C-alpha cells in the first residue's frame, strides 16, 4: 500500500511558514498510529519542519541538497524514493511538491479536514483530490478529535 496522508484547511492549506498552522493533538496521535512501522517519504522542507527523523518509521527524504541526519535516507527524486521504499507500506507525508507527484503512486489518500481558516498569501496549498482518479469514501467524524472530519479516497480501478 502506498498512501498520502495530510490535514487540510477549508482553503486547501497544509502549511504556513514552515509549520502546520493549527494544533490538533488527536490528529497527530492518529498520524503517529497509522504511520508507525511504515516507510514515510517527505520533502526537505517537511523534514526541516520536524528537525529529525520520525521515530519508529523508516524515513526517506527527497532533496537535492546534502543532508546528514541520523536514521534518514536521502534521494534526489520521488521516483527513487518509491523504488528505495520497496514493497512495504509507504506514506507520503508532504510537502506540497511531494503530494503533487505522489498521486501517481498512491493507492489511497487519507485526508483530515480541519476547521481552522488560513488566509495568508504565504500559505502552502495542496490541490483538491482528483475524484476522476480517486473514489471518495464517506466523510466521517475523526475518531481521535471531535470537530474534525476525515475522508479516505481510494484509487479507481475502472
Model-derived regions: residue spans:
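Enzymes that bind and transform nitrogen-containing heteroaromatic metabolites
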Residues: 1-158
Amino acid at each position: 500500500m502506498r498512501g498520502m496522508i495530510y490535514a487540510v484547511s477549508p482553503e486547501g492549506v497544509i502549511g504556513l511558514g514552515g509549520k502546520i498552522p493549527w494544533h490538533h493533538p488527536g490528529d497527530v496521535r492518529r498520524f503517529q498510529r497509522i504511520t508507525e512501522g511504515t516507510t514515510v517519504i517527505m520533502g526537505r522542507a517537511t523534514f526541516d519542519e520536524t528537525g529529525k527523523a520520525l521515530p519508529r518509521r523508516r524515513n526517506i527524504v527527497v532533496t537535492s541538497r546534502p543532508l546528514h541526519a541520523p536514521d534518514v535516507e536521502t534521494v534526489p527524486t520521488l521516483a527513487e524514493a518509491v523504488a528505495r521504499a520497496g514493497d512495504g507500506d509507504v506514506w507520503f507525508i508532504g510537502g506540497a511538491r511531494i503530494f503533487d507527484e505522489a498521486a501517481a503512486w498512491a493507492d489511497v489518500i487519507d485526508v483530515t479536514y480541519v476547521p481552522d481558516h488560513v488566509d495568508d498569501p504565504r500559505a502552502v496549498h495542496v490541490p483538491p483530490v482528483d475524484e476522476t482518479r480517486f473514489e471518495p469514501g464517506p466523510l466521517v467524524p475523526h475518531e481521535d478529535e471531535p470537530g474534525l472530519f476525515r475522508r479516505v479516497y481510494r484509487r479507481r480501478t475502472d
